């Protein structure tokens, strides 16, 4: 095989023929990001980008190309480039630590990539013809990266010196138009005869081993190749020109000699060139899932990126937006790869072949693809701990509580190690700040505590902020209304100190007492008793007290004892069904009679239903006050039919509620249908009905109903509880007087008097969102981070908890918390009830009529 080098041709020259520039106007509100190091030279980043067009989910792999142990290689199916496979299996079989999908490929079988693949200085497959204009990305031996359109020339000479122009190597795209060359990198065996005529010439060590026509597939020799064609004239030439035992020569001329190329792979568009957005091809316009690969200016870092799209939470990206994102990530040159359903990034976080697909494939699963681009760690094995990282379940805790410590161990190459943390020693500074027992830090005095974990010569540190005792306790709920033996997770309990700092207190440190035997709390889960009652849970820690009022069970009101049929009527579906209701003394749970329902579901079409309607004309019974449930006794027949009720709300909207999905018992059983939360009262009980939709249950039967009751929450009681402890903000005052600067906010308007140490901007929530399209608003809010020694006020038109997307809340809080490092920050809104919550130095304040804040002698006071 003869390889020659010919001049490379710039991709831009070709792309200009069919493209036009599209500038990106993408506005980024904020990036939520996290990073995980995969090795000393490889890192994974996840970025959720809030933009003017919506949310983007961006996954990034960064690889240091100067590291001698880091390698880039194209990857493909271990069964050859003619076979598709999901990216995760390619990562497993190749040993890569991370990878993204490759370029365009033929979706049929056998598949082929549009671009070339060079791996370990070996040509695996050549690109499609030059006219297609797809660029090739190559790492050259001198450390440079070349992005250009290749124009290879492949020629094979028959035994009689006949010249055959071969369009591609290891692709069957041209097999019907001329000859193609297939090596063992294509597949283990040749295509062979199927429905179309085919001639295959087997070459071993440049000698014709066999000339085959319409034969089954044969093994492709490791030290040779197969020349194949289904084109009539080419097949005739091949039969005439290739003779068994005669020599053959193959000449492949590439833009670069493979010996000068570390690796090559194909791409779709050259989207960033020399640090600027390049001319963008008009192919695949619109916002879609995207994959891109870029390099920094000196080609020392490779940046692989996926952007999710076609998803309810993520909008995808246009090519122009992709180009801008690549520039923002540090790319000086970049290409985009195949996208859409092919966009995939996989990471082997623990280097154990357990690959995680970190993006969200738009098809809902990985697509089988033809190739990928992998990053490899070739570090020497080492089990010596070089670095220790410590994570705490809480970095801020109250004194005399605890925080869990989690340790991660790495060798000198930042490869994770599986080390038993029992072999680690700890040191706490100051020495009297606390102690570590079984990887749990127990603080013994307020202040800063530095914990050092060490093993051998390796160590890691973490600082824990220890708060003094809390003055108040907070929970997400102040009251509970539960049925009998119900369980309710109370969630985290938050302590607040005198300065407004807060931390979660583990439930094991909370003392729980009870008023009126309503139930019991274990590990933060309350279980109600089986007796109706009204009482309270009292939670205490140190001097802080919090009450939760609890109502258990129900107050019952009997609606019908079923002693007669007044106001009751039976209707059936389908109408030709049969059935009857009657009052009977045969079975009675309470009293002397019950309602007997005989039903016949044998004439079912799509379903069978027996309705017991309430009211003389089926108008129903309007229920008093606000019932929580409807209950009754039912004597079942174990026929497994569906027992339900229909109610209507104040607007006449019908709601169906289950008593039981299946009547699967014989004898009396109490059943309940709970009224849905949020329903608009008053409600009307329309009917009770037995239904069946399963045609295998066409049968007859009888059930009995007794003592229909409406269930209300228990009445309030005077509990005589001690007062809860409260947090009182030292900045809060009853009046703002003698100020040098003052801001008043009322009903969304504000009046500012003074010299400009108070900065106020407006935050607008509309339809559950702080719209990313409101660029002025977000720029104002982000400008808070640039101020120093100011009082910053964000006047909201509603509670930030009314924002539907938790990520928006997180963005807002991150911006405000960064601003609070050098400023005093307030978030205020008119909520009708005065309240102050301090979270990470940011004050969230609810005011009832107006909010006033003033400064005098650098002292800040506010009134809400």
Task: Show which residues each predicted segment covers.
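Beta-strand-rich structural segments
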Residues: 401-416, 451, 486-502
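Extracellular carbohydrate-recognition regions
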Residues: 551-578, 713-735, 743
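His/acidic metal-ligating clusters that form di-metal
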Residues: 771-848, 852-864
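Short carbohydrate-recognition loop motifs
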Residues: 585-611
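Low-complexity "stalk/linker" and mucin-like segments enriched in Ser/Thr/Pro/Ala/Gly
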Residues: 427-440, 513-525
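Zymogen propeptides
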Residues: 22-227, 552
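Extracellular carbohydrate recognition and processing domains
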Residues: 652-685, 700
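Extracellular glycan-recognition surfaces and repeat-rich motifs
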Residues: 568-595
């Amino acid at each position: 095989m003869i390889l020659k080098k010919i001049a490379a041709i710039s991709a831009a020259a070709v792309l200009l023929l069919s493209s036009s520039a599209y500038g990106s106007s993408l506005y980024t509100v904020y990036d939520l990001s996290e990073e995980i190091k995969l090795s000393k030279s490889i890192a994974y980043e996840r970025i959720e980008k809030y933009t003017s067009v919506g949310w983007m989910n961006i996954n990034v792999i960064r690889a240091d190309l100067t590291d001698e142990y880091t390698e880039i290689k194209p990857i493909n199916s271990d069964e050859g480039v003619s076979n598709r496979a999901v990216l995760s299996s390619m990562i497993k079989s190749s040993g890569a630590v991370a990878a993204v999908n490759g370029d365009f490929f033929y979706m049929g079988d056998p598949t082929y990539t549009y671009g070339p693949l060079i791996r370990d200085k070996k040509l695996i497959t050549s690109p499609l013809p030059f006219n297609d204009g797809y660029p090739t990305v190559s790492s050259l031996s001198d450390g440079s990266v070349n992005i250009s359109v290749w124009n290879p020339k492949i020629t094979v000479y028959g035994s009689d010196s006949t010249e055959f122009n071969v369009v591609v190597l290891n692709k069957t795209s041209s097999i019907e138009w001329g000859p193609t060359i297939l090596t063992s990198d294509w597949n283990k065996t040749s295509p062979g005869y199927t429905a179309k005529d085919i001639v295959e010439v087997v070459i071993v060590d440049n000698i014709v081993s066999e000339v085959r026509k319409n034969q089954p597939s044969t093994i492709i020799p490791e030290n040779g190749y197969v020349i194949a064609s289904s084109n009539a004239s080419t097949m005739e030439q091949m039969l005439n020109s290739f003779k068994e035992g005669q020599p053959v020569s193959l000449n492949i001329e590439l833009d670069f000699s493979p010996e000068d190329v570390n690796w090559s792979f194909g791409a779709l568009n050259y989207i960033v060139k020399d640090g600027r957005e390049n001319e963008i091809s008009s192919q695949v316009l619109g916002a879609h899932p995207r994959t891109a690969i870029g390099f920094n200016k000196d080609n020392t870092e490779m940046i692989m990126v996926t952007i999710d799209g076609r998803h309810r939470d993520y909008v995808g990206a246009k090519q122009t937006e992709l180009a801008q994102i690549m520039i923002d990530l540090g790319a000086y040159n970049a290409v985009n790869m195949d996208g859409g359903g092919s966009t995939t990034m996989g990471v082997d976080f623990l280097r154990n072949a357990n690959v995680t697909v970190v993006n969200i494939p738009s098809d809902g699963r990985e697509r089988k693809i033809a190739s990928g681009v992998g990053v490899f760690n070739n570090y020497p094995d080492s089990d010596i701990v070089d670095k220790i990282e410590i994570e705490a379940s809480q970095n801020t805790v109250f004194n005399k509580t605890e925080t869990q410590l989690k340790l991660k161990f790495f060798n000198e190459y930042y490869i994770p190690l599986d080390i038993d943390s029992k072999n680690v020693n700890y040191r706490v500074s100051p020495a009297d700040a606390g102690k570590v027992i079984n990887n749990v830090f127990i603080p013994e005095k307020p202040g800063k505590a530095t914990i050092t974990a060490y093993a051998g010569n390796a160590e890691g540190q973490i600082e824990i902020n220890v708060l003094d005792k809390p003055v108040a306790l907070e929970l997400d709920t102040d009251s509970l209304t539960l049925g009998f033996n119900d369980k309710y997770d109370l969630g985290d309990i938050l302590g607040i100190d005198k300065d407004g700092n807060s931390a979660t207190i583990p439930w094991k440190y909370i003392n729980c007492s009870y008023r009126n035997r309503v139930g019991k709390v274990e590990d933060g889960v309350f279980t109600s008793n089986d007796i109706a009652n009204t009482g309270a849970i009292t939670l205490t820690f140190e001097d802080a007290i919090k009450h939760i009022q609890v109502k258990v069970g129900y107050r019952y009101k009997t609606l019908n004892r079923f002693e007669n049929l007044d106001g009751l009527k039976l209707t059936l579906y389908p109408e030709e069904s049969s059935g009857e209701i009657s009052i009977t003394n045969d079975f009675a749970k309470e009293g002397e009679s019950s309602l007997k329902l005989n039903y016949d579901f044998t004439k079912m079409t799509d379903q069978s239903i027996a309705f017991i309607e309430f009211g003389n004309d089926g108008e129903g019974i309007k229920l008093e006050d606000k019932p929580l449930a409807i209950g009754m006794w039912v004597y079942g027949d174990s026929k497994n039919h569906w027992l339900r009720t229909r109610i209507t709300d104040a607007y006449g909207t019908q709601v169906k509620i289950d008593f039981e999905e299946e009547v699967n018992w014989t004898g009396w059983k109490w059943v309940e249908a709970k009224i849905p939360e949020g329903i608009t009262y008053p409600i009307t009980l329309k009917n009770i009905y037995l239904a069946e939709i399963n045609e295998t249950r066409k049968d007859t039967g009888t059930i009995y109903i007794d003592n229909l009751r409406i269930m209300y929450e228990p009445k309030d009681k005077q509990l005589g509880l001690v007062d809860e402890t409260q947090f009182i903000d030292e900045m809060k005052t009853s009046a703002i007087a003698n100020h040098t600067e003052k801001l008043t906010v009322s009903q969304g308007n504000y009046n500012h008097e003074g010299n400009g140490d108070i900065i106020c901007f407006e935050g607008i929530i509309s339809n559950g969102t702080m719209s990313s399209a409101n660029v002025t608003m977000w720029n104002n809010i982000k400008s808070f981070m640039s101020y120093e020694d100011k009082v910053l006020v964000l006047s909201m038109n509603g509670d930030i908890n009314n924002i539907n997307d938790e990520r928006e809340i997180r963005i807002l809080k991150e911006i405000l918390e960064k601003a609070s490092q050098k400023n005093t920050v307030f978030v205020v809104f008119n909520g009708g009830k005065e309240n102050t919550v301090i979270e990470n130095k940011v004050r969230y304040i609810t005011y009832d009529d107006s909010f006033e804040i003033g400064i005098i002698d650098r002292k800040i006071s506010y009134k809400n």
